[in-house]
């Protein structure tokens, strides 16, 4: 779910009880509960390097409907995602990427909620996933995308991704899973983009308002979706954990059809046999293994470097698309729906004054 990763089919696939997931061979597990942030890395070591944070190129504007183009142009230019925020760094990292807060590093020590409402929401999430008895607490932590199929809107902007990762954190108060995903574009030392989303499941009452006739016929009563609360023009996307053993692998669907699926591993390079095994397993759910492409995990960032980078000043505003204070001396009136050109003329001086 960056990238929409971070990132499931509205119609339930062939019952998962009919298939047994292949046994995983790896036992290593990472529970890093880091909060991913995004930045652009420097391609070479400079005396006074700059770290520029940006969410640009996350999504292709052409993928949005024409009726939103003019409004989207203003939103993009006004939002934090359209700005480059530079920070002077004294460290010598060649690929400095700000990924979160150092306080978030470590094991996930989460407990299940005890009140009745939270327990009800937990049960709804467990039943909303194809994976039997899905446990959002055990699912939390760091996952590496080692293979994926990404077509349509959900895959926009991820075609050249390296080192795609997702960090999942279970929010007990909201009974939701926070999803922080990012990837490095073009090459191991390319620029990084990231986005934060939230996975929530819809109960029976809300589902009746939106479910299709086919879904009613199949009696699918709970569904889970990935939303991006701070970016309103991105539609909610289905989210379904097809299968997982929590310690080694997870298979995640992110579209109503068979156009988006991810193979997750707890380790960045589990080996070709691991990847081939789970590609073939997805064939039982209607996916074509030949169309599922490997995701390069070739970024040379050690855990120590990652922890150091995470101790840098936070970029929460960028990740959550919060609007910056422009410091205007007087009010400016924008009307992007009637005059895009006039709006752009007013915006340019704000960013280049």
UniProtKB/Swiss-Prot annotation:
Gene3D superfamilies: 2.40.128.20. Keywords: Chloroplast, Disulfide bond, Lipid metabolism, Plastid, Seed storage protein, Storage protein, Thylakoid, Transit peptide. Residues 1-27 are annotated as: Disordered. Lipocalin that prevents thylakoidal membrane lipids peroxidation and confers protection against oxidative stress, especially mediated by singlet oxygen in response to high light and other stress (e.g. heat shocks). Required for seed longevity by ensuring polyunsaturated lipids integrity. GO terms for molecular function: nutrient reservoir activity; small molecule binding. Residues 1-18 have a biased composition (Low complexity). Induction: Accumulates in response to drought, high light, paraquat and abscisic acid (ABA) treatments (at protein level). Disulfide bonds join 163-299. This is Chloroplastic lipocalin. Disruption phenotype: Increased sensitivity to photo-oxidative stress induced by drought, high light or paraquat, associated with a rapid accumulation of hydroxy fatty acids mediated by singlet oxygen. When associated with disruption in TIL, highly sensitive to temperature, drought and light stresses than the single mutants, exhibiting intense lipid peroxidation. Seeds of this double mutant are very sensitive to natural and artificial aging, associated with the oxidation of polyunsaturated lipids. PANTHER family: CHLOROPLASTIC LIPOCALIN (PTHR11430:SF32), LIPOCALIN (PTHR11430). It comes from Arabidopsis thaliana. PROSITE patterns: LIPOCALIN. Residues 1-39 form a transit peptide. GO terms for biological process: lipid metabolic process; negative regulation of fatty acid oxidation; photoprotection; response to abscisic acid; response to heat; response to high light intensity; response to oxidative stress; response to paraquat. One of its GO terms (cellular component) is chloroplast thylakoid membrane. Expressed in leaves at low levels (at protein levels). Present in seeds. It comes from the Eukaryota. Belongs to the calycin superfamily. Lipocalin family.
């Amino acid at each position: 779910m960056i990238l929409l990763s971070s990132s499931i089919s509205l119609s339930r696939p062939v019952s998962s009880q009919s298939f047994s997931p292949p046994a995983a061979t790896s036992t290593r597990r990472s529970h890093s509960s880091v909060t991913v942030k995004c930045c652009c890395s420097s391609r070479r070591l400079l005396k006074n390097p700059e770290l520029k944070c940006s969410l640009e190129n996350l999504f292709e504007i052409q993928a949005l409907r024409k009726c939103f183009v003019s409004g989207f142009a203003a939103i993009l230019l006004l939002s934090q995602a359209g700005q480059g925020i530079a920070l002077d760094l004294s460290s010598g990292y060649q690929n400095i990427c700000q990924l979160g807060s150092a306080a978030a590093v470590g094991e996930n020590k989460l407990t299940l909620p005890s009140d009745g409402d939270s327990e009800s929401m937990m049960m709804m999430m467990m039943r909303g996933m194809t994976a039997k008895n899905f446990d959002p607490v055990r699912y939390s932590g760091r996952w590496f995308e080692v293979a994926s199929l990404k077509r349509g809107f959900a895959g926009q902007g991820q075609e050249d991704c390296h080192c795609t990762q997702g960090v999942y954190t279970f929010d007990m108060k909201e009974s939701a899973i926070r999803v922080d995903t990012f990837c490095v574009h073009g090459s191991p030392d390319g620029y990084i983009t990231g986005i934060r989303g939230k996975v929530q499941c819809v109960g029976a009452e809300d589902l009746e308002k939106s479910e299709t006739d086919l879904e009613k016929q199949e009696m699918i009563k709970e569904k889970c979706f990935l939303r991006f609360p701070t970016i309103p023009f991105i539609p909610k996307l289905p989210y379904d954990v097809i299968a997982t053993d929590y310690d080694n692998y997870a298979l995640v669907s992110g579209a109503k059809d068979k156009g988006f699926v991810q193979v997750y591993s707890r380790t960045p390079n589990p080996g070709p046999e691991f990847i081939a095994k789970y590609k073939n397993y997805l064939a039982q759910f209607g996916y074509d293994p030949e169309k599922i492409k490997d995701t390069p995990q070739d970024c040379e960032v050690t855990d120590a470097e990652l922890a150091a980078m995470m101790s840098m000043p936070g970029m929460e505003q960028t990740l959550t698309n919060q609007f910056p204070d422009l410091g205007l001396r007087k009010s400016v009136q924008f009307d992007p729906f009637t005059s895009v050109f006039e709006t752009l003329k007013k915006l340019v001086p704000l960013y280049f004054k």
